[in-house]
Every structure is written in structure tokens, then in C-alpha cells.
Amino acid sequence: MQRIQLAEDLQFSRVIHGLWRLNEWNYSDAELLSLIEWCIDHGITTFDHADIYGGYTCEKLFGNALALSPGLRENIELVTKCGIVLESPERPAHRSHHYNTSKSHILASVEQSLMNLRTDYIDMLLIHRPDPLMDPEGVAEAFQALKCSGKVRYFGVSNFKDHQYRMLESYLPEKLVTNQIELSAYELENMLDGTLNLCQEKRIPPMAWSPLAGGKVFTENTDKDRRVRTALESVQGEIGAASLDEVMYAWLYTHPAGIMPIVGSGKRERISAAINALSYKLDQDQWFRIFTAVQGYDIP
């Protein structure tokens, strides 16, 4: 498994396991532990969480499984996010869906995540979404307090556009080390609007959520779906990939930004597709055939 350097003493596995839908997998603690161990055995050591996943339940489910084998903690990297507030039975005091990136909320969210995940520290904390009411000085104070206490090692953001990223980072004593963005061989917005360019400018490898675009290309039948599917099938035959999943992952891996896809499945065979795709590299012709199919028109 390739390793991606994010900071001097922090590496992530190229493939990241996402726990967004963990509560829907209906795994026992022992079954989830088995999946975590399988991931580690196959080189996947980075696990992506958020406080709100599963209506505030997924972190706790993961922590319960990890508690069965506490020694595994030193072999993995934990990512979590905060800043979104949801109405939920798990949070009866919440009255509406809104953002909260205040210093007090960030600190309280991290304390809860540490308890949920059964750990003393988080490797990476991300601000989940840009907050139009964000006080960047308060965020900086929260990050500094968490860093000094050893509760969070590094910080990043999620879904930030380039101007939002630059604004927040300008207040921080240390640079952000990733931006988790939607990116796939189906959704190109962040590749075309400067967001991915900023990651390259800053030398920060991005994390990519929804790298298979939620499966739309496999299940829907719009003009775009048919175009992209045809291009993927053409490249699949040329490189000998076992599935269209593998082609979509290989398309991301071919980009020089060091994109780390987040695989949000509890099925080993679906996770394996992201691993297997590391053995493929598309040439320019193959990569641009897919790119052009997604856009729906030829490049200039």
C-alpha cells in the first residue's frame, strides 16, 4: 500500500476507509473489529469519521470495536470532523440544523469524539464545512489549545474552496495539511474551480469523498451516465481492470496531486477494488477520454 506524507511525522494510507454509513452495516463489535483488522492487513490504516455520522452514532460504534483490541490504536490514523450541528435524538439540546465553528463548540466536539473513539488523541481534525459565521481567530485558538494538549496532532478542512482555505489558514500558526473534497471521474467541480490547484500549490494531498459518485454512473441512465460509462468501459478493456470501480479509482490515482480516495463501504470486495486499482496508471489518452466524457464536450 502506498503511503502519503501529509506532515513530517504523519502519513496516511493511499486508500482511506470511510465510516459515514457504519451504522447501516449492522456489524457486531467483533465483526467490525474483524473488518478493521482486515483493512490494516491490506495496508489501509487511515479511518475517516465525523461527529455527525450516523446521527452521532458511528464514532461510538467504531470505538466500541476498537476497545476489543486497544493495541490497534497505534497502528492506525483517525480522522474526524466537527462544525455541523444536526437535530438528533442523540443530541436533544440541538434545535436546528446549522454550523458552529466557535472555539467552545470545537473543543467540546473533540472531547466527545475522544470519548466515542476510545482514544487519547485524534490524528487529524477537519472543519467539516465552510461556516459563513466563522470566527477564524476562535478557530485558531481552539486548534492551538488542542495541539498543545496533545488531543489533536494536525488540522485540515473539508469542502473548502480556495478562498475559504486561504482565509482560515492566514489566521493559523501552522498550515493546514489536507482538504477533503468531493472528487471523482464523474464530479469535476473541485478539479476545475481552483480547489484542487490550491492543494497542489500548498503541497497538501487532498482526501476525496464519494470517489465513485455514489454509484450514479452504474445505476442511472442520463446522457452523462451513458457517456461516462462508455468511456470507463473502453478504458477498462484496455488496462484489464476487473470492474468500473477500479477504473474510477485509477483515474484519481493517475492525477499528480496524490489524491486519497475515501472508500465508504463495509464490503471487503468493494474496498479491494480501491486497493487493486493502485496497480493501474492511465495514459493521457485514457485519462482525457474519461475527462471529456464527464464534461460532455471536447477540450479546447
Swiss-Prot record:
Keywords: NADP, Oxidoreductase. NADP(+) binds at residues 210-220. Its EC number is 1.-.-.-. Gene3D superfamilies: NADP-dependent oxidoreductase domain. The keyword rRNA-binding does not apply. CDD domains: AKR_BsYcsN_EcYdhF-like. The active site is at 53 (proton donor). InterPro entries: AKR, AKR_Detox_Biosynth, NADP_OxRdtase_dom, NADP_OxRdtase_dom_sf. The keyword Oxidoreductase applies. GO terms for cellular component: cytosol. GO terms for molecular function: oxidoreductase activity. Belongs to the aldo/keto reductase family. Aldo/keto reductase 2 subfamily. This is Uncharacterized oxidoreductase YcsN.
